[in-house]
Amino acid sequence: MNYFKAAAELIKQHRPDWPLLIGPEEKLFDSLQIGGHGGVSGGANLFPKLYVKLCEAHRAGNLARAQELQKQIQRVSDSFYRIGKYSSSIIKGIKCAASCLGICDDFMAEPFHRFRAGERELVKTRLKEIEAEIAKLNF
């Protein structure tokens, strides 16, 4: 986060018209705390309201709510991005979950391959769990 903080300071001083976005959604709240404007978050393809509500809560100064939503975002990451043993697991997890939600197909270009049946079932189970948890957040 040191590099991100330095970038935030430079942008604030020299290019305040530029947005500053973070990649790892696990750091979204932290990035907002030090001057970031949002993120490029894979999980936002699955649960866009969750990510928008975190940014809105932070912007409104409701840090407790923003932290609560960040915990749920961490849960999304933990649930879908670490299935399997390859570095492609984050892409596979997002694509498979998006496919299960009817957003897109889970076909992946070579050299990658979609999850097999067992992994897909795990994604479906975790999707149901996450959807139930998000429903309790009342937004």
What are these regions (language model features)?
Residues 36, 47-139:
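C-terminal alpha-helical cap/extension of soluble enzyme domains
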Residues 1-77:
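Catalytic alpha/beta core domains of metabolic enzymes, predominantly
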